[in-house]
């Protein structure tokens, strides 16, 4: 079974040459780029953080919701005890997450002030927001640790909108710079 990959760089797809089987050549990503890899029925995103995003992530104090996950999520896929509390990562440079919203499985994707879906109501983001991830359907904006930080009227009162993005089982190979997605 092959692995489907699509790169998202500044809002445009890039090539799929960065993937082979269950390995993602994450060291070939530039900061601010994300690759999306099909794994079974779900897709996994790997985002390379900038130096500024890494510093900001390391300063994060965590959330009471970090260890919670939706009841519909398979219990064998979460929680992962090997990710750092602040960055929610195996290594600070990369954030690896399932592309589905913890609310209802809607798609979560990369967003930046330079490019976004202009047909969507983003008034809840206010001014000065940074690149991060967004669930357009439920109006939830996540920082680069995958924690929700802004909510629109559709999700503000939903407890599931307070949950962080879900992290797949994976490991980082320091010698090659590859991320390996682990299947259960």
Predicted regions and their residues:
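Rieske [2Fe-2S] iron-sulfur-binding domain
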Residues: 62-183
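Extracytoplasmic/periplasmic/luminal assembly and interaction segments
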Residues: 30-87
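General detector of N-terminal leader/presequence modules that precede the first folded domain
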Residues: 1-30
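A residue-level signal for beta-strand positions that form part of recognition/binding surfaces
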Residues: 21, 34, 43, 132, ...
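Short small/polar-residue motifs
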Residues: 20-24, 30-33, 163-171
